[in-house]
Swiss-Prot record:
Keywords per UniProt: Ribonucleoprotein, Ribosomal protein
Protein name as annotated: Large ribosomal subunit protein bL35
Gene3D superfamilies: 4.10.410.60
Disordered: annotated span: 1-22
Signal peptide span: none
InterPro entries reported in the protein's UniProt record: Ribosomal_bL35 (IPR001706), Ribosomal_bL35-like (IPR021137), Ribosomal_bL35_CS (IPR018265), Ribosomal_bL35_sf (IPR037229)
GO MF annotation: an example: structural constituent of ribosome
């Protein structure tokens, strides 16, 4: 049976945690930041976790994670 290819875009966006979850970065923090409130930018800074609803898709994209 051939090896399964990892989706390279997903490999760059998600990191697996020790407990089996996936860390991700929040969206809306790359450009056009002047009109966004400081509070909004501050809350977007820490890493988020992939929800359990999306976990099936992420695991399918990262078969060896």
């Amino acid at each position: 049976m051939p090896k399964i290819k990892t989706v390279r875009g997903a490999a760059k966006r998600f990191k697996k945690t020790g407990s089996g979850g996936f860390k991700r970065k929040h969206a809306n923090l790359r450009h056009i930041l002047t009109k966004k409130a400081t509070k909004r930018k501050r809350h977007l800074r820490p890493k988020g976790m992939v929800s359990k609803n999306d976990m099936v898709l992420v695991v399918a994209c990262l078969p060896y994670a």
